[in-house]
A protein has these predicted regions:
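Glycine-rich phosphate-binding/hydrolytic loop that grips phosphoryl groups
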Residues: 19, 108-119, 261-317
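Glycine-rich phosphate-binding loop of actin/hexokinase-like ATP-binding domains
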Residues: 125-184
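Glycine-rich phosphate-binding loop and adjoining helix at the ATP-binding site
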Residues: 34, 38-43, 50, 58-63, ...
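Short glycine-rich, Thr/Ser-proximal phosphate-binding strand/loop in the N-terminal lobe
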Residues: 2-43, 51, 58, 77-80, ...
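Short glycine-aspartate micro-motif
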Residues: 2-8, 60-64, 129-134, 140, ...
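A mobile "lid/hinge" subdomain adjacent to the ATP/sugar-phosphate binding pocket shared
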Residues: 14, 24, 181-255
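Phosphate/pyrophosphate-binding loops at sites that engage ATP/ADP/AMP, CoA/4′-phosphopantetheine
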Residues: 45-63, 104-105, 123, 199-205, ...
């Protein structure tokens, strides 16, 4: 069977999927292993792809990789100075893919890939003015305007909503900024933000082996004072970031993804209420919906890009 191969290089796990006609035939995950170089990780990644193809007797028609950083999707280059893998900018990922499989290759930022996946196969269907925000290891964003992906001269446009400063007196972010949405309310910042609170030693959170958003929301529901405070701060940070995206890009719909959306019944009403209070246009109705493709939006987005190669690739992205 001929399939497109989608690879989503997330902050914690790398996901590999075989896609046929917009359907995932098979998928697997491997650890992101940020303590290795990208060149080392790519070899292990390729072995994982080949094993999945062999197991399901499939032949690749193209390889699409979603990468967690700023990328030049036209020249297929990694542009970020700060990326998960220190050698990433030195890797010619297009040549590596061609040498390994000899098939067409698509390359995109992971948030943009997720937006494309939701636009074509999930919560963004039938909507050409769309904002996606993913709440996970970091905070990723992407923007679609009139059916075209927003990129800008340096491929930054719409992609750095997680690095908008919302607290001038906040924590330092790993990007070098202060009080970014990401440093205020992302998974990588959560443990540090919680443990430095003077309320930590008397909070139930101090007994948790791992402090994550599931534990914060669980203890908040039980009335823990610190958990309630952290939950409110994070929801306000996420919503402030979303409002910044709305006033900047005027979307019809906002899609929120990431593992934290297990608590969507709490988060979505909170976000909607704050947006309504801060709307510039009377009766402006902006849809706020949870992502539908929580696991594989990036893989589906990359498989969609593969179908455009040689067709209307430029008109969409």
């Amino acid at each position: 069977m001929d399939v497109g191969v989608g690879i989503d290089m997330g902050g914690t796990r790398i996901k590999i999927g075989l896609v046929k006609d917009g359907q995932i035939i098979a998928a697997t995950k491997i650890p992101a292993s940020a303590d290795t170089t990208l060149s080392q990780r790519l070899n292990e990644l390729a072995d994982g792809v080949d094993m999945l193809l062999k197991e399901h007797r499939c032949t690749p028609t193209g390889i699409g990789i979603a990468f967690p950083g700023i990328v030049n999707s036209d020249e297929k280059k990694i542009l970020s100075k700060y990326v998960k893998y220190p050698d990433a900018q030195k890797i010619n990922i297009s040549s590596w893919t061609m040498e390994r499989w000899g098939v067409p290759f698509a390359f995109e930022n992971d948030a943009r890939a997720a937006l494309l996946g939701e636009w074509q196969y999930g919560a963004g269907r039938i909507c050409d003015n769309l904002v996606l925000i993913t709440l996970g290891t970091g905070v990723g964003t992407a923007v679609l305007i009139n059916g075209k992906m927003l990129k800008g001269k340096n491929y930054l446009a719409g992609n750095l909503g997680g690095h908008v400063s919302i607290n001038l007196h906040g924590a330092e972010c790993n990007c070098g900024g202060t009080g970014c949405v990401e440093s205020e309310a992302s998974t990588w910042a959560l443990q540090k933000n919680v443990t430095r609170s003077p309320k930590f030693n008397t909070s139930a959170l101090c007994r948790e082996e791992e402090i994550n958003f599931n534990s914060v929301f669980m203890w908040a529901a039980k009335g823990d004072e610190l958990a309630l405070e952290v939950k409110e701060n994070c929801q306000r940070a996420w919503t402030t970031g979303i409002i910044n995206l709305i006033v900047s890009y005027d979307p019809e719909r906002v899609v929120i993804g990431g593992g934290i959306m297990n608590s969507k019944d709490i988060i979505i009403p909170y976000v909607k209420d704050m947006i309504k209070k801060n709307s510039w246009i009377k009766d402006n109705h902006i849809e706020v919906v949870p992502a539908e493709q929580l696991e594989y939006a990036g893989i589906l987005g990359m498989s969609y890009l593969l179908t455009l190669i040689g067709k209307e690739y430029k008109s969409v992205i």
